[in-house]
A protein has these predicted regions:
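Conserved nucleotide-sugar phosphate-binding/catalytic loop shared by glycosyltransferases and other
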Residues: 12-71, 301-305
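Active-site-proximal region of nucleotide-activated glycan assembly enzymes
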Residues: 15, 42-43, 102-164, 169
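Donor-nucleotide binding loops and adjacent catalytic segments primarily
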Residues: 16-17, 35-37, 163-168, 172-255, ...
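An aromatic- and histidine-rich active-site surface loop
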Residues: 30-34, 86-104
Length: 365
């Protein structure tokens, strides 16, 4: 959900520049409201939402009742707010909202951040007025007649972040390259465990910024760091979460180890960074990672095989990280290939498409 708030926040800036009034619609009891307040300051309204599917017949009936209620609430909300157009990213709240919008003839756009759409986006793409996607390979999964490629909107500061100032933010030096490890706002425990195991070996050749997430991993990672020699401890910069300085972490880095979420596919090119990606299984991250790998901007390591069976350092995670940290020329070539994939005008493309959609519908913008 944070990803949706941030990506729509970038688009919101472009829409607000066009003097458009914005409203974020989320679900009751969800985490959206707090994130919206913190990340974008957009006004927020909630409606009832539930999964289109259910784990069993009882759950399916219950969800159907909740969705019907959500559609009624969405109709009332649309009549009250009179939106010129609606943009969604595929969460549960989008289905009742898009159904109500279609009934009331309000144009809608569904936006696909990842390469491969999930069930929700596939369903919504059929009823949406227009579909937008981040990357060209997604076109094979979506209705071509109404799908456009916009890129993925990211913070504009990523394109111009200053390396020297960014390193100063974290107290980093130029004596060794900087590895940035992160697994999203909630972290990635398997990556964190692998980094814990490899910590002394990596710190001998690099400085590390490690954003471990808010799931309690900081405690045992901090304990592992405290057992290191003092000179290696000074090279390790551990945070559960970065609020306000994530851009500087990208700016300070020479190499990234991360999952392969949609935001990563856009942030790495924006920051001109190569990466070793460890896709999370079962959520289409493999296809996301393959996109950067195919363009020579990243290397993919399987989540289940990061470490060696005998010696952890014999595994592909350490071997690939070590190779890229040591081989400056290869790292810089990958960085250039990564930068070539950037779409700095993605937020403007989505905003323009949404405004055009509203104008063609005859609705007042």
């Amino acid at each position: 959900m944070q990803r949706a708030v941030v990506e729509l926040g970038a688009t919101a800036d472009a829409l607000e520049a066009a003097d458009v009034r914005l409203l974020y619609v989320g679900s009751f009891g969800g985490m959206e409201q707090g994130l919206v307040a913190r990340e974008s300051n957009l006004p927020f309204q909630a409606i009832t939402a539930a999964a289109v599917r259910g784990r069993n017949p009882f759950q399916l009936v219950k969800n159907s009742v909740l969705i019907a209620r959500g559609i009624r609430e969405a109709r009332a909300l649309i009549r009250r707010e009179r939106p010129a157009a609606i943009l969604g990213t595929g969460g549960y709240v989008c289905f009742p909202l898009f159904v109500a919008a279609r009934q009331l003839r309000v144009p809608t756009m569904i936006y696909l951040p990842d390469i491969v759409p999930g069930l929700a986006v596939k369903v919504l793409a059929r009823i949406a007025t227009q579909v937008a996607c981040s990357f060209e390979p997604s076109l094979s999964y979506l209705p071509r007649g109404k799908t456009i490629v916009t890129g993925y909107p990211v913070r504009s500061e990523l394109f111009t972040v200053d390396r020297v100032a960014s390193r100063a933010t974290f107290g980093l030096t130029d004596e060794a390259p900087v590895l940035f490890v992160y697994g999203g706002s909630r972290g990635a425990r398997r990556i964190n465990r692998a980094i814990e195991t490899l910590l002394p070996d990596v710190l001998r050749i690099a400085q590390i910024i490690h954003v471990c997430g808010r799931e309690g991993d900081e405690t045992w990672l901090r304990a592992a760091a405290d057992r290191l020699p003092v000179e290696l401890q000074a090279r390790y910069h551990l945070f559960p979460y970065l609020h306000g300085t994530m851009t500087q972490a990208f700016g300070a880095a020479d190499l990234v180890v991360a999952r392969a979420g949609a935001s990563t596919l856009a942030e790495l090119p924006a920051a001109k960074l190569p990466a070793v990606l460890v896709p999370l299984a079962g959520v289409h991250q493999d296809e996301n990672a393959d996109y950067l790998v195919a363009h020579g901007a990243a290397i993919k390591v399987a989540d289940h095989a990061m470490l060696g069976s005998d010696e952890p350092t014999d595994g592909p995670l350490f071997q690939e990280v070590r190779r890229l940290l040591i081989d400056t020329r290869m790292r810089e070539e990958m960085a250039q290939r990564s930068a070539a994939l950037a779409k700095p005008d993605a937020d403007g493309r989505i905003a323009d498409a949404l405004l055009d959609l509203a104008a063609r519908s005859g609705a007042p913008v």
